[in-house]
Swiss-Prot record:
Disease: Bardet-Biedl syndrome 18: A syndrome characterized by usually severe pigmentary retinopathy, early-onset obesity, polydactyly, hypogenitalism, renal malformation and intellectual disability. Secondary features include diabetes mellitus, hypertension and congenital heart disease. Bardet-Biedl syndrome inheritance is autosomal recessive, but three mutated alleles (two at one locus, and a third at a second locus) may be required for clinical manifestation of some forms of the disease.
Organism: Homo sapiens
Record keywords: Bardet-Biedl syndrome, Cell projection, Ciliopathy, Cilium, Cilium biogenesis/degradation, Cytoplasm, Obesity, Protein transport, Transport
Compositionally biased tracts (Polar residues): 13-22
Protein name: BBSome-interacting protein 1
């Protein structure tokens, strides 16, 4: 860097770029170099990507099974109570 700064005063840091035309000249001095081998890194702006929404059930399958079992158990209890009530009415 020191040798390059001695040959080119714009690299020494002593001379500052004062206006846009000088800036354009400095930018034109540098050329773009793409590697022929190895990874190439590209800066990219992160953007939101919309994807298809995944619909989840409000109740899990196991919860639905438990509710069905509970409902069936309540129905059988009601039927048994009705049968006992009918037997009591018949015997009285």
């Amino acid at each position: 860097m020191l040798k390059a700064a001695a040959k080119r005063p714009e690299l020494s840091g002593k001379n500052t770029i004062s206006n846009n035309s000088d800036m354009a000249e400095v930018k034109s001095m540098f050329r773009e170099v793409l590697p022929k081998q190895g990874p190439l890194f590209v800066e990219d702006i992160m953007t939101m990507v919309l994807c298809k929404p995944k619909l989840l059930p409000l109740k899990s399958l196991t919860l639905e099974k438990l509710e069905k079992m509970h409902q069936a158990a309540q129905n059988t209890i009601r039927q048994q109570e009705m049968a006992e009530k009918d037997q009591r009415q018949i015997t009285h």
